[in-house]
Swiss-Prot record:
Belongs to the Fe(2+)-trafficking protein family. PANTHER family: FE(2+)-TRAFFICKING PROTEIN-RELATED. This is Probable Fe(2+)-trafficking protein. GO terms for biological process: cellular response to oxidative stress.
Amino acid sequence: MTRMVNCVKLGREAEGLAFQPVPGDLGKKIFENVSKEAWAGWQRHQTMLINENRLNLADPQARSYLMEQMERYFFGGGNVDAAAGYVPPTR
């Protein structure tokens, strides 16, 4: 049976994550309140931030920045950084 959550990002009930995606209290909060669909959206945004800002994930400051952005993406009203000069692909 699929685990359902009231997703804070989508504002509706949706399929929940299968496991806690990050350790700690933030990971628990995400597991309990974020859907698979919203998590996939974060992964796309995170990839854009890493690539456009040329973040080195071996750098503790870069990892801390991404954790802060993740919390803001889900629980900060969507108030997250956008990569400077990023232009979404045209279809």
